[in-house]
Regions:
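Short beta-strand-loop-alpha-helix junction that forms the active-site gateway
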Residues: 162, 168-169
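Accessory nucleic acid-recognition modules appended to NTPase machines
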Residues: 1-163
């Protein structure tokens, strides 16, 4: 029903690509992704080439349509020290975990990703603006050199001018 509404309202011509985009997003909740990765995965899985290739623009448009239909929400990554947002990759969370599970046939029950999605939804229900935090740290490599590594803060919840940093695992 929800896909039919999107197809009618947005005049979607390629239902197969919309469904594949939905399936890939359902399978990757809580993982960093972007339209380019989704398009590459679709083209590779379906062995598409030439004019049949799914473009990044098409995937971006379809991801936007899924978000407009309240099926997914994009959560941006935020550089805590640099105080700016990254363009890509971001995370996408299902607005309804039950729909996500039904869509992918109740397989892929990665509890950490599902729990992350549930926590994200709870924070949003409580009225928080939510970002994924990124902090850079210096660590020693195996060769003994200092290297910069990005560390993730699961959530930065902003509510009423107050920031709360949440690391659940």
């Amino acid at each position: 029903v929800y896909l039919k509404d999107i197809v009618e309202r947005k005049k979607i011509k390629r239902l197969d690509i919309l469904e594949a985009t939905l399936d890939l997003l359902c399978s990757s909740v809580g993982s960093l992704t972007n339209p380019n990765n989704v398009a590459k995965a679709m083209n590779s899985k379906q062995k598409l080439s030439g004019e049949d290739l799914v473009s990044n623009n098409t995937v971006t448009s379809y991801m936007d349509h899924l978000a407009d239909a309240y099926l997914f929400e994009e959560c941006k990554r935020y550089d805590v020290k640099g105080k700016n947002y990254f363009d890509y990759p971001n995370k996408y969370y299902c607005e309804d975990i039950g729909l996500r599970n039904a869509r992918i046939g109740f397989r892929q029950q990665e509890l950490t990703h599902i729990m992350e999605n549930i926590i994200y939804n709870d924070l949003r229900i409580r009225g928080c603006e939510v970002d994924i935090g990124v902090v850079y740290a210096t660590e020693k490599s195996k060769a003994g050199n200092n290297v910069q590594v990005a560390r993730e803060i699961d959530f930065i919840a902003n509510h009423g001018g107050k920031k709360t940093y949440i690391q659940y695992l």
